[in-house]
A protein has these predicted regions:
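Conserved N-terminal alpha-helical segment that immediately precedes and caps sugar-phosphate-binding
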Residues: 1-89
Length: 89
């Protein structure tokens, strides 16, 4: 069992190492730093279906690391949930 857990962790670590650091990636990181840390906004993720599940996971992961984040479901946004957004988000 320990071996399978170690193998899983090694695969996950390799997957993180394989993330390409492109200009788009760097711009996304800069935007997050600017809006959240300098302007005191929060990260807002959104999506439906599988993309929504991933967006929700991203928001909860950022929250657990102390970065203000919220998931906004697109259909709920049209019915009043846009109120969660503030100026620096």
């Amino acid at each position: 069992m320990i071996e399978s857990i170690q193998e899983l962790l090694q695969k996950e670590a390799q997957a993180v190492l394989n993330i390409p650091v492109t200009d788009a990636y760097e711009k996304a990181v800069e935007l997050i730093v600017e809006q959240i840390h300098r302007k005191k906004g929060k990260l807002v993720t959104s999506g439906m279906g599988k993309a929504g599940q991933i967006a929700m996971n991203i928001a909860t992961t950022f929250c657990s690391t102390g970065i203000p984040s919220v998931f906004l479901h697109p259909s709920e946004a049209q019915h009043g949930d846009l109120g969660i957004l503030q100026e620096n988000d």
